[in-house]
A protein has these predicted regions:
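Transmembrane beta-barrel strands of outer-membrane/channel proteins
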Residues: 125, 252-258, 304-308, 362-366, ...
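Transmembrane beta-barrel wall of Gram-negative outer-membrane proteins
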Residues: 249, 279-370, 388-415, 585
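Outer-membrane beta-barrel channels and translocator barrels
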Residues: 242-244, 284, 296-298, 309, ...
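Periplasmic N-terminal accessory/gating domains of Gram-negative outer-membrane beta-barrel systems
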Residues: 66, 90-245, 249, 262, ...
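Periplasm-facing N-terminal accessory domains of Gram-negative outer-membrane beta-barrel systems
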Residues: 2-10, 15-142
Length: 722
């Protein structure tokens, strides 16, 4: 029954997504552009064009057509707009009901009749569905669709699931078993996640902030034709937050389900074969409150949300250990293995029109999350699974826009994603319990192999840009920079793991813990120039981007462990791991085939550098490249399940064989990265991406454009280790 309902919801989601126009501009602001003529077909320069919407705190944005009769109103939020055209000696024309989704440029043209009286002609036409100017391929989910989706799919991966061309691991329909999913679009990996145009990935590049869906107005995914404003070699998922308004509004919602609504296929035949439990949902819940409105009308708005959601599951064939704390695993059939997760978000966004020209947005989400027992189905006993508590965690952002005049726009923003997620012991596990792995079935019990007493993977991001927009050109220069830190402290209980085969001890693994490694991204920076040039029915999109990436490893002092197996160790700081520089051109063209804004031919080509976190610095950290683990054989001659030998003695003694590496605690001489791989121009992994597309609006109203797309990707390989 659950599967049937899920398929139905999935088909509904896919159908709704296909009703949304595709294409985009850079930081997911929308635009309205077009040409103004008189009734004879001659272009009209100097026409005042106004775009008004309740979505704008400043109420209206105004530009003037250039000498080609073209105009382009940029930096618009998603919403419904009325566009007014005014010129002395002509009747005023007003176009109502223009609906903008994020990243979409709506073509709104006008033919002004000559008139001596101040008369306004109001036109309510269909909203353009084909973006004839941008070449970026985009899919959009609106807030209405997000509200309709089940709790299990209210995360960033939702849009990936319903976008054709993606492959990989997708969201589990039974309740967010994995919020951190891998995927690829036409073979391109490296998905970047953004909130309001700034990264929310943590230091290693995975999901750093779990989004409160009640704060989201739209979610967009760009998959090809990405402009010079991004260095993504894969896709980009961007979440557009909601804003308050001049009217107070709010919402209270609550969803809950339990195992009482779930069927089971466990029958007598399966029980006879030894299956006693099945995987099932214990509960899924989602509660939320939103409230927003004016603090001061047309001046200061707010929108806030509190949301708490989570789930619980039972894992088939997995049981808690009845004899926990001993060398033995005895499944407790009365306690099936379970997994619980909960998430809490307290978010608020403030929009401030500080002056006629200066607008600020501030966002804060103080979150508290727990992946309580992140176990697999059969890989370990529940007590040996890892459990993470995300605290402190959250997202903090601020941005500023300043239109100097109708042509010149300044923008800036900063973001901080905080992700601290140390592990904690599962119920019943004592600090003295040693992790044991049964080699006959690769099953671990008693404790986890390793733990993290500290894990901070924070990321900061900043951006600044200057746009100069006429009707014919949309020039933009800007800079983006990100910094990240991965601060991880690792320990192993007792500094040892045991390996058994069929319950008999066979070997010991010794660890040189605890140790703490700090890896940084000092700069993931991009400087770019781009232009959108409209020439009759042809629009050229071209740009150039310079990317610079600099990694760093902090100096560290590791005291001698309590076991005394290795001495205190000191490691010097290492800079420029890596230090990469790249020049990345972008070019695209969009052609309005019939001039009616309903058919567009598009192509794009560009070079994109690979998404990179702190992984390269971590791989070159002298702590990571040291010999931190060794194994030795163990023959338990007296069956007491305790190694009767001196583990400080690196040679054969008592019941223990020699250490597998006599350099325990020292450097490994066999692995290092070549300098020409770590530093220089053009050595970073990169893609050349080529895309062609035909978009045709097949109907009006809710009917969508249809597209056929061919994408080719060429990957530039590089050596990594020598």
């Amino acid at each position: 029954m659950l599967r049937t309902m899920t398929v139905g919801v999935g088909l509904l989601a896919l159908a709704c997504v296909l009703l949304v126009p595709s294409a985009a501009t850079a930081q997911q602001t929308s635009a309205i552009a077009g040409i103004v003529r008189d009734t004879s077909g001659a272009v009209l320069p100097g026409v005042t064009v106004e775009a008004a919407s309740p979505a704008l705190i400043e109420k209206v944005r105004t530009v003037v057509t250039d000498d080609q009769g073209r105009y382009n109103i940029v930096d618009l939020r998603p919403g419904t707009y009325a566009v007014t055209f005014t010129l002395a000696g002509f009747n005023t024309m007003k176009r109502e009901g223009v609906v903008l989704t994020s990243g979409f440029t709506a073509a709104v043209n006008a033919d002004l009749p000559v008139g001596t009286l101040q008369e306004t002609v109001t036109v309510s036409g269909e909203t353009p569905l084909v973006d004839t100017q941008n070449v970026r391929r985009q899919t959009v989910l609106t807030s209405d669709l997000l509200d309709a989706l089940p709790t299990s799919t209210k995360n960033w991966a939702t849009i990936v699931e319903v976008t054709p061309g993606f492959s990989g691991s997708f969201a589990d329909v039974a309740g967010q078993l994995n919020q951190n999913l891998g995927n690829a679009y036409h073979g391109k990996t490296g998905t970047k996640r953004q909130f309001d145009g700034m990264s929310i990935d943590h230091a290693s590049g995975n999901v750093g902030y779990l989004v409160n869906s009640n704060m989201i107005q739209e979610v967009s995914l760009q998959s090809s034709g990405i402009s010079a404003e991004s260095n993504a070699d894969g896709s980009v998922v961007n979440m557009i937050p909601k804003e308050g308004g001049n009217l107070y509004s709010g919402n209270i919602s609550g969803l809950y389900t339990s195992d009482r609504f779930e069927a089971s296929n466990l029958n007598d035949d399966l029980r006879a074969r030894g299956l006693t439990t099945v995987s099932k949902i214990l509960k899924i819940y989602d509660t939320g409150v939103t409230f927003g409105g004016p603090i001061r009308k047309d001046k200061l708005w707010f929108f806030s949300s509190f949301r708490e959601w989570g789930n619980g599951h039972l894992m088939a064939g997995n049981f808690w250990n009845k004899t926990q704390g001993t060398p033995f695993y005895t499944p407790d059939l009365s306690r099936p293995g379970d997994r619980f997760q909960w998430y809490e978000s307290k978010a608020v966004r403030v929009t401030w029109q500080a002056s006629r020209r200066n607008k600020f947005n501030f966002f804060s989400d103080v979150a508290d999350d727990c992946l309580c027992r992140a176990i697999g189905a059969l890989g370990s006993a529940p007590e040996a699974g890892l459990a993470f508590h995300f605290r402190p965690t959250g997202l903090y952002q601020g941005d500023w826009t300043m239109p100097i005049n109708s042509k010149l726009l300044l923008e800036g923003g900063a973001s901080l994603t905080i992700t601290h997620w140390p592990t904690f012991l599962n119920p019943g596990v004592q600090p003295t319990d040693i992790s044991i792995i049964e080699l006959s079935n690769n099953f671990r019990y008693n404790a986890s192999a390793t733990y993290a007493y500290k894990r901070a993977t924070d990321r900061g991001a900043q951006r600044f840009s200057v746009s100069y927009v006429t009707g014919t050109h949309a020039y933009k220069v800007g800079m983006q920079i990100e910094e990240a830190v991965s601060d991880v402290g690792t320990y192993v209980q007792g500094d040892v793991n045991y390996s058994f085969r069929n319950g008999v001890p066979t070997s010991i693994t010794q660890y040189a813990t605890p140790y703490r490694a700090i890896d940084r991204t000092r700069a993931d920076m991009g400087v770019y120039f781009q232009d959108q040039w409209a020439v009759r029915r042809l629009t050229l999109n071209y740009g150039l981007r310079y990317d610079y990436f600099n990694g760093h490893i902090d100096a560290s002092h590791i005291p001698a462990p309590a076991s005394g197996w290795v001495p205190a160790r000191d490691f010097a700081a290492v800079s420029g791991v890596p230090a990469w520089k790249d020049i990345n051109p972008r070019f695209g063209a969009s052609y309005d085939l019939f001039g009616d804004g309903k058919t567009a031919l598009k192509m794009s080509i560009g070079r994109y550098v690979a998404k990179t976190g702190t992984a390269v610095a971590s791989a070159n950290n002298p702590i990571s490249t040291s010999v931190n683990t060794v194994t030795r054989t163990w023959t338990d001659t007296n069956d007491n399940y305790a190694p009767d030998c001196d583990l400080n003695n690196r040679g054969t003694n008592g019941e223990c064989g020699p250490m597998s590496d006599a350099n325990f605690g020292g450097f490994s001489p066999t692995t290092h990265w070549a300098d020409d791989v770590l530093r220089g121009y053009g050595v970073r992994n990169s893609n050349w991406d080529f895309s062609t597309e035909v978009q045709r609006q097949l109907g009006s109203g809710s009917r969508s454009p249809r597209a056929t797309t061919a994408t080719g990707t060429a990957t530039s390989p590089r050596r990594t280790i020598c």
